Amino acid sequence: MLARDALNALYTFGGVFAGTALGWPVFLAGVFGVVSAISATLVSWIGGRADRHWGPKPVIVACALALTAVCVLITGLGRQQIFGLPVAPGSHLPDALFFLCGVLIGGAGGAMQAASRTMMVRHTTPARATEAFGLYALSGKATAFLAPWLIARATQATGNQSLGVFPLIVMFLLALVLLSWVQSKGEAQQ
């Protein structure tokens, strides 16, 4: 739930961040979305092959770590500076880095969602699949407010939209901690 909420917040607030913190026009935010979608297609395919070879848990871990790295990069990204280091006026470095973030958000997000569903299949039986996937869908809705609320509180507390992403780092890391107790092969097959 935590990783899904954080990922959904990245999807939702990516364009908002680009428009407000980086000053992107709507057109460029649209290009960002297309780039993210294309990377989601390619990396999800690669993630599916990795899932088949190593199982879903390592894919989920790798994707959550990549998304955590994206959040860390966003916390230090701005039009005039990157992690406190000044950026030359007119530099496209912040834009290029945020496009890289979009590639990683789309790619790692798509692969993580697919691997999460594979993990669900491993943790249910055919007789309980509808119930398990129904609870999985409900859990995503039950806490959907959490990440946006935390982003709003962090942004308000720091006065910095980039630092407002910090709670997502915590959410991804907590998800990884909780994932350590999940059995890779699934309970249904043991």
What are the residue ranges of the model-derived segments?
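Cytoplasmic membrane-interface "Motif A"-like loop-to-helix N-cap segments
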Residues: 52-66
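Multi-pass alpha-helical transporter architecture, strongest
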Residues: 77, 165-190
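A membrane-interface helix-boundary motif in multi-pass transporters
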Residues: 90-93, 153-172
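Loop-to-transmembrane helix entry/capping segments in MFS-fold secondary transporters
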Residues: 26-27, 126-136
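Short amphipathic helix-loop junctions that connect adjacent transmembrane helices
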Residues: 12-29
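Intracellular juxtamembrane helix-capping segments at the cytosolic ends
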Residues: 111-124
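Helix-to-loop junctions at the C-terminal end of transmembrane segments
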Residues: 42-56, 82-83, 155
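C-terminal ends and interior cores of transmembrane alpha-helices
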Residues: 65-91
